[in-house]
Amino acid sequence: MNSEYNAQKIEAQAQKYWQENKSFEVSEDTSKEKYYCLSMFPYPSGSLHMGHVRNYSIGDVISRYQKMQGKNVMQPIGWDGFGLPAENAALENKVSPAKWTYENIDYMRDQLSKLGFGYDWSREIATCHQKYYRWEQWLFIKLFEKDLVYKKNAIVNWDPVDQTVLANEQVIDGRGWRSNALIEKKKISQWFMRITNYADELIYGLDKLDGWPDAVKTMQKNWIGKSVGLEVDFPRHNADSIKVYTTRPDTLMGVTYLVISSEHPIALEAGKNNPQVQAFIDECKTIQITKETMKTIDKKGIDLGVKCIHPITSDDVPIWIANFVLIGYGTGAVMSVPAHDKRDYEFAKKYGIAIKKVINENISIDKNAMTDKGVLFNSGEFNGLNFDQAFNEIAKTLTDKNLGRKKTNYRLQDWGISRQRYWGCPIPIINCQNCGIVVVPEADLPVVLPEVMSFDSVGSLIKKMPEFYQTTCPKCGKMAQQETDTLDTFFESSWYFARYTCKDNNDKMLDKRANYWLANGGVDQYIGGIEHAILHLLYARFFNKLLRDEGFIKNDEPFKNLLTQGMVLKDGAKMSKSKGNTVDPAQMIEKYGADTVRLFILFAAPPTQNLEWSDSGLEGVHRFINKVYRLIMDFIQDHKSHAIGTLNNFDKAQKDIRLKTHQTLSKITDNMSRRYLFNTVIAALMKLCNTLSKFNDTSKTSMAIRQESIHILLKTLSPIAPHLCHYLWKKLGNIKAIINEPWPNVDKSALVQDKMQIIVQVNGKLRTKLMFSTDVDNAQIEAQTLANENITKFTKGKIIVKVIIVPNKLVNIVVK
C-alpha cells in the first residue's frame, strides 16, 4: 500500500491533465446556464502575496462548484499592466517599465498555474498591450464626440512625488494613495469624463444590487453625495453676486457672515490690494485641505472688509476668507449660520462675529450650536414654520425675487482622467494651433506608447520624445503635437470584465458574446477587496453604462453579486514587507503543496472576515489532506480482496454512516450554494473523514457504502483541493475526470432516522438532551421527560404550569 502523499507529483499530474484537455476553456453554449465568475485581476508587481491567494482561491472554489452544477462557467484572468509602480520599479532597477512588467507577468502566471486555479487562459489579457488599449482609445474618441470627455483648466490634486495629477478618489486624508505624499493644488489643463451625467443612475442603481454588501453601497451613495437644497444669491454693491448652496434654507434668516475659499475669484482680487489678505491666501496654499481633513484642522479666517446683501432682509453681511472652504466643492462660498452649525459657531466665537438664533426658541445656544431642525422664530414672515414648510416658502420667496432656486447638488465631481506619466495608455488626441483639439483618425489607432530601453527620471518620458509628439494635423496637414498625457489606469480596469468575453475580436471593442456572458445582471460573482468601493467599483459601474449606451451590452450593471474578502493578517497586522510579516506563497507551495495552502486559506476564516495566518493551522490542514489520502488508499487496498455490493439492507452501523454522509452533503451544499462558508464546509468534511476512517467493515454492503461516502467526500472536496481529488478519483478507477463530474445529490432516504434528539428546557433554560424513537407521540415524550432524573431535580416541589413541545426539536417545561 502506497501511503506517502507526494504533493508535487500529484499536483503536476493534475495540472498537466487540465492543460492538455483544456478543462477550463469555454465558449458560448445556449443550452446551458452561463456562470461568469471573476476575481479582480492583479497588478503584476513581481510575485503573488497571500491576499492574492485568498482572493483567487475563493473565486476558484465558486467556479468549480458551479461547473459541477452543470453550468457553462467562465473564469478568466489577466493583468492590470499600466501604472506608477512599474515606473518606480523601472527607475530603481534601470530597466524599461515594459520589460519589468512582462517579466513579472510571466512569473506570476506560473505561480497562478501552480496553485491550480481553473482559468480560461485563452482569454488572458494585459491592459498594457496595444491590442487591449487600442479599444479604449477608440472609446475615448466616441465619448469625446458625445461631449462625455472634455478638456478644461482646473485646480487639480498634484502629487509632487509621483509627478502626476490624482483624481479626488485617489487622495486619502490629503495624501497620494500610492506615494503617501502631501497633495498640492495646481491649476492645469486636464482631461475629464462627465461621470456626473450618470450620478442619479449610479445612485438609484445601487438599490437593485441585492447581491452587494450594504457597506459598499453605502460608501458609493455617500461618495456620490446627492443632496437637494437651494442655490441662493447674495448680491454685492456694484459687483456680481455671490452664489451659495445650502441644504438648510430654514436657517437663512440666521446668516451673520459668508465665508469663501482662498482660491475664490473675490479673494484673489482682494489679495491684490491687501497684503494681509494675500498673506492669508499664501498661508492657505501651504495647508493640505480635503473634505476629510476639514473636520480636524484649526479653523482660520480673515475679514475681507467688504460686504454682501442678505437676499431677504437686505442687511449687510460681512465676507470672510476661511481655510476650510474648498473651491472645488459647490460654489466655493458658504453661508454661515453660527447658531445652528457647529463649525460656524466655533468660528464666530473665535472671531467675535454675531450669532443669531432662528430655530427652537427655548433651546439654549450658550455653549453649543443647536443643529436640529425645528420651528422657526426670529425669522419674520417665516415664523412658526417647520423645516419642510420653511424650505418651500423661502424657496418661493427667493425664486420670486430672482435671488434663488431649488437645486440638486452632488459631492461627486467629473473624473479627471489624464496623467503626466509615461507608463499608461496614450490619449488619442492631436493638438493643432490652427484646428485646436483634433481626434486621431480611427485608421491610425492605436496610438502606440513608444518603448524605452531604460528609465532614469521621474515624470513623463514621452514629453521629451519629439519622435512621439511631433506629428501632422489630420485636418489641415500642418505641424501639430500628439497629446503627451496618458490615461488614468482606472480607465483600463473599468471595462476589462467585458473584454474577456471577446478578447480575440480584433475588429470590434465588444461583440454579441458580451451579451451572452453579461446577461441577467452582468458578472455572476465578482470578488475583491472593499478598498475598491469608491474607485474601481464606481468607475466600472460608470463604464458599464457607457458601453450600454454605445450599444455594446444590454445590462445596466457590471456585477450581479459582489464578495469583498477580508485581509490576510500575521501577528495581528496586515501582511507587508515593511512590517516584515509576509509569508511567501511560493515557499508554502513548495513545502506543503498548493492544496494545503488553498485549504488553509479557506478554512481559517469565512471569506468576508480577516484571516490570521497560522503555521500550526497550515500543519493541521496538511494532516487532514494526508488523512484523506490514506482513507482512499486503504479503501483501494481493501477493494483488491473484497467485492463491492449494492446499497440495500443496511444494519444500524451502515445506516449511521450513510446518515452522517448525507447530512454532511446536505449541509455543505447549502453552505457552498448560498453563503460561501467554505470554512464550515471544510470542517464538516474533516468530521466526515474522521467518521469514515473508523468504518473499516469489508462486507459487500459496507464496501458499497464506503465507496458511496468517499465518492461524496472527494467530489465535495474537489473545488477546494482539486489536485488531490483529481488524483484519488483516477486511482479509484473512474474513467471520467472528477472536474467533469456533477455535484452529488442528497439521498433523502438516508436522512430518515430511527431516533431523534430532543432539547429539554425548564423555564426556557437548557437542562438536558434526550433521545426518543421517531415514532413516539407527544404524550410519551412528555411522560418520559417529566420522569427523567435530570429534569425532576428542577421540577421537584414546584407546580408544572404547562409543557410545550416543538415536534422533533424541543420540550419546554414551565414551572412556578
Swiss-Prot record:
Q: Where in the cell is it found?
A: Cytoplasm
Main subcellular localisation = cytoplasm
Q: Which GO terms describe its cellular component?
A: cytosol
Q: What is its EC number?
A: 6.1.1.4
Checking Pfam families in the record gives: Anticodon_1 (PF08264), tRNA-synt_1 (PF00133), tRNA-synt_1_2 (PF13603), tRNA-synt_1g (PF09334)
Chain span(s) of sequence motif 'HIGH' region? 42-52
Decide whether keyword Transit peptide is in the record. Answer: no
Write out the residues that bind ATP.
K577
Q: Which residues form the signal peptide?
A: none
Q: Which GO terms describe its biological process?
A: leucyl-tRNA aminoacylation
What reaction does this catalyse?
A: tRNA(Leu) + L-leucine + ATP = L-leucyl-tRNA(Leu) + AMP + diphosphate
Q: Which UniProt keywords apply?
A: Aminoacyl-tRNA synthetase, ATP-binding, Cytoplasm, Ligase, Nucleotide-binding, Protein biosynthesis
MF GO annotations: aminoacyl-tRNA deacylase activity; ATP binding; leucine-tRNA ligase activity
List the Gene3D superfamilies: 3.10.20.590, HUPs, Isoleucyl-tRNA Synthetase, Domain 1
Which enzyme class? ligase
Motif window: 'KMSKS' region:
574-578
What the entry lists under InterPro entries is as follows: aa-tRNA-synth_I_CS, aa-tRNA-synth_Ia, Leu-tRNA-ligase, Leu_tRNA-synth_edit, M/V/L/I-tRNA-synth_anticd-bd, Methionyl/Leucyl_tRNA_Synth, Rossmann-like_a/b/a_fold, tRNAsynth_Ia_anticodon-bd
Record family assignment = Belongs to the class-I aminoacyl-tRNA synthetase family.
Recorded hits in HAMAP family, A to Z, give: Leu_tRNA_synth_B
**Protein name in UniProt:** Leucine--tRNA ligase
